[in-house]
Amino acid sequence: MKKLLTIVLMLVCSHVFAQDSLKSFNNTRINTTSSGMEILGGWGALNLATGAIAWPNSTSPEARYFFKMNTIWGAVNFGTGLLTYASLQKQRKKHFTAAETLKEQQRIEKIFLINGYLDVAYIGTGLYLKIVGDSRHSPIMKGYGESVLLQGGFLLLFDGLMYKAEKGNGTKLRTFLEKHPITFDGRRVGIVFNM
């Protein structure tokens, strides 16, 4: 009876430890991503405000197109930051299993990695527009090109830093899950024995 009681107590304590740790990992992921969305939303608001003021007041056609494109990018970045931030706040109340925690972590890492590749494409597109705009003396292509270069550069830096932060969180999570292979899904308790 003592052995059975000891095993049950160990399972319960292990489960509580694992759940608190999983909650901590989820909070770290949500906090990291939320902070990133605040930065992205702030960048978007800055571009919206400066673009809305400078676009109609620019005397140079190239500058007008630059600020017009920045205003559009600002709206997209602000909207993305705001909607993602709101979605993350709903996740704070959710109870994640170990499998769900790992899935969410992998998903956010993949999002920032793919965005990084897209940012390189934005920079290439902006550079192309600027070069072609210079050779054709096209203010619209030069203005749009410079804006896309600026936005792509910022987003590459942003997504790169976010990927690095999230990848670090993911590495800690994967290490934790390898060391503590006790699982609980609300109905069943499982122990994995490595042989």
Regions found by a protein language model. Give the residues of each.
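Long, highly hydrophobic alpha-helical transmembrane signal-anchor segments
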Residues: L40-F66
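Helical transmembrane-bundle signal
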Residues: G44-A54, G74-T84, Y122-G126, G152-M162
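Loop-to-helix transition at the N-terminal end of transmembrane alpha-helices
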Residues: P61-N77
